[in-house]
Amino acid sequence: MIYIDNRQDKIKIDEKTLNTLDEIIKYALKEEEVYVNTEVSVILIDNDTIKEINKETRDIDKVTDVLSFPMLDYPKGKTYKEVYKDYEFDASYLDEGELVLGDIVLSLERAEEQSKEFGHSFLREVCYLTIHSVLHLLGYDHMEDDEKAIMRKREEEILNKFSIKR
């Protein structure tokens, strides 16, 4: 189940965009070979709130666009399909029969700022940040150049499937 919870009132987000986020997350999970019932929470917030969370969780006292809180552990350089695709999850991993992949906290305010800065649509920015974060929940990272190239390629492949271009 995908849970999208809009906890801010500074930026309007329409039902079509929310539905696109839901669809794009489900597509990404399928493409990444996540075949079990899953739970992903997407919490939409403002800049002040994400700054607080960033300070509390990462000790970085500044606004960021999106934060990912994965529930599964991955060996360095490995993703869900390499580690967990055929894994038999016991009850400790499940919540009411769903595998909890993690939480995504996204600042719609920052997404709007970045969409203007980068010269593309708000929809594109919100979808990009969401997919970026979903891939983090699935073990992708971008700390090393080779990992970054792989992650960026996956992000663009998923966005292109939905005709979401820069």
UniProtKB/Swiss-Prot annotation:
<keyword id="KW-0479">Metal-binding</keyword>
<dbReference type="GO" id="GO:0004521">
    <property type="term" value="F:RNA endonuclease activity"/>
</dbReference>
<comment type="function">
    <text>Single strand-specific metallo-endoribonuclease involved in late-stage 70S ribosome quality control and in maturation of the 3' terminus of the 16S rRNA.</text>
</comment>
<dbReference type="InterPro" id="IPR023091">
    <property type="entry name" value="MetalPrtase_cat_dom_sf_prd"/>
</dbReference>
<feature type="binding site">
    <location>
        <position position="132"/>
    </location>
    <ligand>
        <name>Zn(2+)</name>
    </ligand>
</feature>
<keyword id="KW-0862">Zinc</keyword>
<dbReference type="InterPro" id="IPR020549">
    <property type="entry name" value="YbeY_CS"/>
</dbReference>
<dbReference type="GO" id="GO:0008270">
    <property type="term" value="F:zinc ion binding"/>
</dbReference>
<comment type="similarity">
    <text>Belongs to the endoribonuclease YbeY family.</text>
</comment>
<dbReference type="GO" id="GO:0005737">
    <property type="term" value="C:cytoplasm"/>
</dbReference>
<keyword id="KW-0963">Cytoplasm</keyword>
<dbReference type="GO" id="GO:0006364">
    <property type="term" value="P:rRNA processing"/>
</dbReference>
<keyword id="KW-0255">Endonuclease</keyword>
<keyword id="KW-0690">Ribosome biogenesis</keyword>
<feature type="binding site">
    <location>
        <position position="136"/>
    </location>
    <ligand>
        <name>Zn(2+)</name>
    </ligand>
</feature>
<keyword id="KW-0378">Hydrolase</keyword>
<feature type="binding site">
    <location>
        <position position="142"/>
    </location>
    <ligand>
        <name>Zn(2+)</name>
    </ligand>
</feature>
<dbReference type="GO" id="GO:0004222">
    <property type="term" value="F:metalloendopeptidase activity"/>
</dbReference>
<dbReference type="Pfam" id="PF02130">
    <property type="entry name" value="YbeY"/>
</dbReference>
<dbReference type="InterPro" id="IPR002036">
    <property type="entry name" value="YbeY"/>
</dbReference>
<keyword id="KW-0698">rRNA processing</keyword>
<protein>
    <recommendedName>
        <fullName>Endoribonuclease YbeY</fullName>
        <ecNumber>3.1.-.-</ecNumber>
    </recommendedName>
</protein>
<keyword id="KW-0540">Nuclease</keyword>
